[in-house]
Regions:
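Active-site cleft segment of glycoside hydrolase catalytic domains centered on the general acid/base Glu
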Residues: 121-122, 126-131, 157-259, 264-266, ...
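Hydrophobic faces of well-ordered beta-strands that scaffold small-molecule active sites
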Residues: 61-67, 106-108, 146-150, 199-203, ...
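C-terminal edge beta-strand
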Residues: 29-35
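Substrate-binding and catalytic surfaces of secreted/luminal carbohydrate-active proteins
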Residues: 233, 239-240, 266-331
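Residue-level recognition of secondary-structure-to-loop junctions
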Residues: 4-8
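N-terminal substrate-binding region of glycoside hydrolase catalytic domains
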Residues: 40-134, 138-144, 153-179, 270-273
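Extracellular recognition modules
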Residues: 13-17
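Short, solvent-exposed loop/turn segments at the edges of extracellular beta-sandwich modules
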Residues: 19-24
């Protein structure tokens, strides 16, 4: 008998050579085998999971969640169920379920034009303004507020890429400033015309090293100011968020100083905080405290997450895996 584990489910053709003790071939045997996916035990031992409730949170504490891709998930056949096994198959019921379980804010990314010349979406939820409006309508029905995250690009932006939207290619800094102010203002009036859902707006996403193709601090701050004006002209009560990618290397300190120097009108300095990349909790606390005490601005974690398993479920290497980012820095 011999055991062999196939790489994936399917039909395999097997050729085996039979040899004598001296290594002489006696014959060859051909056959086929069909490999099936293994049955995976998805049961969770809840007795081993204890999450202590944080007491005395302020009434305005943000319990946020990003559901930017949920509409494309539903369209692709993804099924969510409530605790009673009832299927949730639309974004409105999904938001109501979240509200019933303590979520009070939804974060939604917006890309300028996430489609190619043939109208094919780039993926990632194809998060255009129309998609954000659908999610805003669902939030309104559920009584949830919304943070709109304008990447000011046609697809994902992060510290490594801050691509200029197709329609703005070749623009000067002044032209970009006029364009981003107009785009944000018009988009918000489409997403939430009644002005009762959106209460925070990110002008850019993880903009530590650049924004709309600009890497010079003065130019970036000019664009931040233009985007902020677009927000405040829409609704002066909406809070403007400037978002950097990490609290490490004094990033919040540096950028709060930069924003002060160039007199950018904003309300909150946000940061991403992924424990396996972004340092200790004590450093995060120190960076936030600096923004609050030095510049009298609010600060927040705008993005965070951690892996719920180290298992490989799809054949693609996990970001967090055994021996690589599999423990948090200071959690």
């Amino acid at each position: 008998k011999a055991a062999y584990t196939t790489k994936s489910a399917g039909k395999y053709y097997v050729v085996a050579q039979l040899k004598d003790a001296n290594g002489n071939e006696l014959c060859s045997v051909c056959t086929t085998i069909t490999s099936k996916e293994p049955e995976i035990d998805t049961a969770v031992d809840n007795d081993d999971i204890v999450v202590a409730k944080v007491k005395d949170l302020s009434s305005d504490f943000i319990m946020g969640m990003d559901i930017s891709s949920v509409i494309t998930e539903f369209n692709s056949g993804v099924v969510y169920k409530d605790y009673n096994g009832k299927e949730i198959n639309n974004v409105t019921d999904f938001c109501k379920f979240l509200a019933e379980n303590g979520i009070n804010h939804i974060r939604v990314r917006v890309w300028n034009d996430p489609y190619d010349s043939n109208g094919n979406g780039y993926g990632g939820g194809n998060n255009d303004v129309a998609t954000a409006k659908k999610i805003a309508d669902a939030c309104r029905s559920a009584g949830i507020k919304m943070l709109v995250d304008f990447h000011c690009s046609d697809f994902w932006t992060d510290p490594g890429k801050q691509m200029v939207p197709k329609a703005w290619k070749g623009y000067t800094v002044d032209e970009k400033a006029a364009a981003v102010e107009k785009f944000i203002n018009e988009s918000l009036n489409t997403i939430d015309a009644s002005k009762d859902v959106v209460d925070m707006v990110q002008v850019g996403n993880e903009t530590t090293g650049g924004f709309i193709g600009e890497t010079n601090t003065k130019a970036m701050c000019k664009l931040f100011s233009a985007g902020s004006k677009g927000v405040k002209d829409y609704n002066s009560d909406v809070k403007v968020v400037i978002h950097v990618e990490s609290p490490q290397k004094n990033t919040l300190k540096k950028w709060s100083d930069n924003l002060e120097e160039y007199k950018v009108d904003y309300d909150i300095l946000g940061t991403s905080y992924y424990p396996y990349w972004h340092g200790t909790l004590s450093n995060l606390k120190n960076e936030i405290s600096y923004v609050q005490t030095k510049h009298n601005k609010d600060a927040m974690v705008a993005e965070t997450s951690y892996a719920y398993t180290l298992d490989d479920s799809d054949g693609h290497e996990n970001t967090v895996r055994e021996g690589n980012n599999d423990d948090s820095a200071d959690a």
